[in-house]
């Protein structure tokens, strides 16, 4: 079954392993006949900073129920349309200091936002992304998996899987953590890329 897939990508270095992952995922989706679009936050010059006018958009949404009536970042509205189109999201980024980079966190802050990605129904958060069925998070890091789990409590799982997507009612969330990237040889890296391409070709 084909799935309309939105890739959300961030890494500042064009020669990064994350960029190789992006290409593998795109190739797999192409082979599998899955319609797909890519948000490249750096290429889009996305501003991750939450400015006063961005917070004011929350108040406007509270009064009107329409985020588009506020002075919201135009890129946010552009991303909103892509999110509404998607049946699956694939996020690709590195782990820095045990969490996602500021650019990706800014995307969560400004785009997974009331009136954009969810509505507030009393204490409940209700997804507005009615087509979205699945989220896959692919992260890279140089920390061993057991250290990230035992010492840092898989912090990304708490903040992004449970604290963001699960909270707005999206529970089919898969996190693929690729660990010890710098310490791994070229052969191992190629195997990871082949596995990812095959996964998204299905």
Enumerate the language-model features and the residues they cover.
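Short, structured loop/turn "capping" segments at alpha-beta junctions
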Residues: 114, 118, 170-173
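Conserved beta-strand scaffold positions in the cores of enzyme catalytic domains, especially
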Residues: 7, 36-40, 137, 172-177
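A structural micro-motif
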Residues: 3, 34, 133, 170-171
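Short, histidine-centered active-site or binding-site loop motifs used for metal coordination
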Residues: 9-11, 139-142, 177-180
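Glycine-rich phosphate/pyrophosphate-binding loop and the adjoining helix
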Residues: 32, 147-202
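Short, glycine-/small-residue-rich phosphate/pyrophosphate-handling segment
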Residues: 119-166
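N-terminal beta1-alpha1-beta2 submodule of the flavodoxin-like/Rossmannoid cofactor-binding fold
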Residues: 1-116, 183-202
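Structured loop/turn residues at beta-strand edges in well-structured enzyme cores
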Residues: 84, 102, 130-133, 171
